[in-house]
Amino acid sequence: MKLLNKIKNENAIEFQILIEKSEWEKKHKESFEKIAKKTASKLKIPGFRPGKVPVEEAKKHVNEIEVFETTTNDLIPQVLTFLEQDESFINDDSETVDTPSVDILDFKDGELSLKVVYDLYPVATIESYNDLILTPIVNEAFEHEVNAEIEHALNSKSQRRVKDDNEFIEKGDEVRFDFKGMIDSVPFEGGSAKDHLLTIGSNQFIPGFEDQMIGLKKDERKNINVKFPDDYHATDLAGKAAVFEVFIKEITNVKPQELNDEFAKSFNLPNVNTVQELKDYIHNQIVLAKQEKNSERAWLEIAQQLLAKAKITPIPQSLIDREVSTLRQQVLSQLSQYKIELKQYLEFSKKSEAQFQEDLIRQAKETITLALLVDDIAETQNIVVSDEEVKERVAEMAKLYQGEEQAVIEQLSKNPDAVKEFLLHKKVVNYLIDLNKNNQPKNTTLSSK
């Protein structure tokens, strides 16, 4: 076996290999014998029982094209081993894409010439990334947000009892009812609803509405007379008198949960034993949620600017095809969760299969480019992920699957590179956000949403 030539460009490395006559003949003989035995087991010839045809007889019926193809395919692993042990391959530090393609160049005088092509990973570069414009964001939890979560938690643990038909509405009750609003006997837009839920005393409705519901019983009807406030947000209703026909369907007595340390302990949260510790925990969770949401939003802004500034060498088709396949599978998986077929999705989106494929190709190229840029920035800025960080992340993810923690840990531990890639991406995004946090677009105000 000989290396005849090596041709390298920015997209690929091509190696031309010669399999000499002695090697070819040896492997050809092995292939011929193997195929002859297989042929003998299937061949039907008058005078011989099925499967009992002698191998020597079967050799007369062997398909030579099949032998040639089998010989070539059986030699390929040896060719790759030979090539990857050759100095011209070992000393080349180019990053190649997975398995190479192998094609026949020539077969002459009992010698086979093969072309082995390794696609090269593209190289993405960017001149600068400290001038990215980001919408300003404040990752802060406000008191009213914490109180709203506390109120929601209190309501979730309140004692509830559906009242009997002869019991009437009291302040604090939750009422399910239908209503129809009219002004001058004419219904107005947005003034009607069925099975609406209202806690009496919450002041969700206009002044006087809830007070007039007190004392009603299930299945009762009543006309409630109110006046929209002069400063009502819907200017066409502001200051006008209205009548609401209400029909009571269900009354639920709600015994509020008291906000105390026992309530705080009932959630079994780590290091939460008092009301203040519960509020601190909720505060931190709100901050973390905002950080995650704002990080995702910032990455969308960053990604578009990186793509606009980046330069990249041609992306091998094999890499694009693989990423397209992954993206397509992700779409199909998401659609299956909602029991939607791809054909239906394309109809909803008003896209053809060809347009859908074009979108996937564009997304694939962008995904590959961004991944290369993230890796390049990480290397340049010495951003790394330790094995300990991977273990911590695996443990965090396992906690989301109560009762299956160990199985999740074992599964994720089999592919630590995927976890490491996720964490590296997150670190690079946080680095870019911090680097560009003062680069704000003109005429913007801080937002905490």
UniProtKB/Swiss-Prot annotation:
One of its GO terms (cellular component) is cytoplasm. InterPro entries: PPIase_dom_sf, PPIase_FKBP_dom, Trig_fac, Trigger_fac_C, Trigger_fac_C_sf, Trigger_fac_ribosome-bd_bac, Trigger_fac_ribosome-bd_sf, Trigger_fact/SurA_dom_sf. The keyword Cell cycle applies. GO terms for biological process: 'de novo' cotranslational protein folding; cell division; chaperone-mediated protein folding; protein transport; protein unfolding. Residues 172-257 form the PPIase FKBP-type domain. It catalyses: [protein]-peptidylproline (omega=180) = [protein]-peptidylproline (omega=0). It comes from the Bacteria. Its EC number is 5.2.1.8. It is found in: Cytoplasm. It is an enzyme of class 5 (isomerase). Disulfide bonds: none annotated. One of its GO terms (molecular function) is protein folding chaperone. Keywords: Cell cycle, Cell division, Chaperone, Cytoplasm, Isomerase, Rotamase. Consists of 3 domains; the N-terminus binds the ribosome, the middle domain has PPIase activity, while the C-terminus has intrinsic chaperone activity on its own. NCBIfam families: tig. Involved in protein export. Acts as a chaperone by maintaining the newly synthesized protein in an open conformation. Functions as a peptidyl-prolyl cis-trans isomerase. Belongs to the FKBP-type PPIase family. Tig subfamily. This is Trigger factor. It comes from Ureaplasma parvum serovar 3 (strain ATCC 700970). The gene is tig.
